[in-house]
Every structure is written in structure tokens, then in C-alpha cells.
Amino acid sequence: MKPLILSCSQASNKNELDNKYGKYHILNSASLKDGKADAIVKFKNTAKLTEIYNTWLTSFDKETVLVLAHDDVLIRDEQWVEKLEQGLKKYDVVGLAGGINAKITAPCLWHIMCPREDLRGRVSHVVEGSNGSETYVTDFGKQGRVLILDGLFLAFKIKTLLSAEVWFDQTNPCVAHFYDIDFSLTCNKKQLKLGTIPIDAVHNSPGLKKYTDDWLAGQAWFLQKFIDGKY
């Protein structure tokens, strides 16, 4: 069964994605035109990712491999479907970047909580001011098993999560923050293996620019959950 990319976007349609991100967005990813993979974007989305993702877990065949990806991610690796298939033979959930040995403390960003030498994976980014003409690679470290995966790309077989009774926690107050860290730690608690695989993808985002009220509320929620021993 071919993988299914699922993404949420505030844009109204593909034209808006083109205008906002140029060519670097999820619907321009490799393997879509040749039918090796499918993609669905929930446009005009204002709901929390945790709510949408949980709905999707029960909306498709249990054998389906879901790829939950940000709308500003372009998968340009022509062999990503094959690499994903191999990666899911080794790990229960795969991603592009993450880390191990996290020290849970504020600020709760995975690449800060994990020591530099314990980061894994690689992701390309668009050079700011280049109008999309240039990209560069952020090489976090060698590929391998991780404790936490970045939410820009999370892939798994639906039945793996359902069998382990893993869901996205909808008590998370954020629209699009902390769901990935919480999900990753929940997977680990349920004995699922997470790891990064070498898929060439571009994330057309500069990352978190400031700690918004939404983000700070999510951090407080996450830290309390950690203090309460939920992981």
C-alpha cells in the first residue's frame, strides 16, 4: 500500500501554497505525480493538529502508512518511498530529525534539550532572501534511533499506533506546538522505536522566531505533564 501524506494548511488552496512558499511545499513533493504516493491537504485549517491527526488515525485503512508533514515541507528525494519502506522495517515511527538523551527543561525545544552530539538526521532549508533559489543543509548528526522526532515529518503504519494505543494528546492547548515532543515521549513509553532516515527534504521555514503566548502555554502544559510522570 502506497504511503499517504497528510498535511494541514491555513491556505485556501494550492494556488495560495504556491504564492506563499513557491515550489517548496508539500504538494510539489516527489512521487506524487507518478502515483507512488498520495497526498491530502486540509485547507483553511484552524483546528489543533492533535485533533486533526487523531481523526486521521481512524479515517483510513489500518495498513496505511501515514506521513504527517507540514505544508511547508518539500520532499524532493526521488527514492523517499523506498527509503520510508526500509525505515519502517527498523523503526515504528520515522522522521527526518530528532535527538536522544533529552534533559526536560525550559526552553522546551528538542534541539536545545538534547545535547548537540546527540542530535540525529538532516533537513534542508531555504536561504532567507534568496527568493527560493538557494537551499542549505542543516546536518544534525548521523542517522539513528532517537527519543524525540521533529513534527515536520512523522511517518508510521496506522495499525502500529492503534495496537500500542498511542494517540495525540488533545489536552495540549497549542494549535501546532509540542504535539511532536509529547507524541514522541508517549511512543517511547509504549515501547515503540523512533528513528531518523536519510530522506532529502526542504523545510521552507525559519523556525520559531519568538515565544508566543500559545507556545508558552504549551510549554507549561508539557512541563506539568512531565512533572506528573506521564512519560
Language-model segments: which ranges?
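N-proximal low-complexity "stem/linker" segments adjacent to membrane-targeting elements
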Residues: 1-28, 39-40
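Conserved glycosyltransferase catalytic-site signature
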Residues: 50-54, 149-152, 174-185
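Active-site nucleotide-sugar/metal-binding loop of Leloir-type enzymes
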Residues: 54-65
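Short beta-strand-to-loop acidic/aromatic patch adjacent to the donor-nucleotide binding site
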Residues: 63-74
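Acidic donor-binding/catalytic loop of UDP-sugar-dependent glycosyltransferases
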Residues: 73-86
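C-terminal catalytic/acceptor-binding lobe
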Residues: 165-166, 170-231
